[in-house]
From Swiss-Prot:
The lineage of its organism: Bacteria, Bacillati, Chloroflexota, Chloroflexia, Chloroflexales. This is Hydrogenase maturation factor HypA. Ni(2+) binds at residue 2. NCBIfam families: hypA (TIGR00100). Keywords: Metal-binding, Nickel, Zinc. One of its GO terms (molecular function) is zinc ion binding.
Length: 114
């Protein structure tokens, strides 16, 4: 379960940011996770609660924005969101699309203080 190591890294980064900002508590952590990032959101939430114990994030809410897979279709010459991230074919023309624009993100976007 690599989500636990990801959760520990999030807690470490956020704790350092809190210390740098001079705040003692973080109330929310905002993440963006792409559909291809290989992270299970529920497992990350569970792991985050464990990793945050005894830290400035102990009571923080983990808010996750799930990012769909967006690819560039050279045939249509446009970016398209894939309805099924396992099929890399344009939903409009049916041609294969290999250039991933979005969907691999794993980003700490923002921290919120009380």
């Amino acid at each position: 379960m690599h989500e636990l190591s990801i959760a520990h890294n999030i807690v470490n980064i956020a704790s350092a940011a809190a210390a740098e900002a001079g705040t003692e508590e973080i109330s929310a952590v905002y993440l963006r996770i792409g559909a291809l990032a290989g992270v299970v959101a529920d497992a990350l939430r569970f792991s985050f609660a464990i990793a945050a114990e005894g830290t400035p994030l102990a009571n923080a809410e983990l808010i996750i924005e799930e990012v769909p897979v967006t690819v560039f279709c050279p045939t249509c010459n446009t970016e398209v969101t894939l309805p099924n991230p396992r099929l890399f074919r344009c939903p409009h023309c049916g041609r294969p699309c290999g250039q991933i624009i979005h969907g691999r993100e794993l980003e700490l976007v923002a921290l919120e203080t009380p």
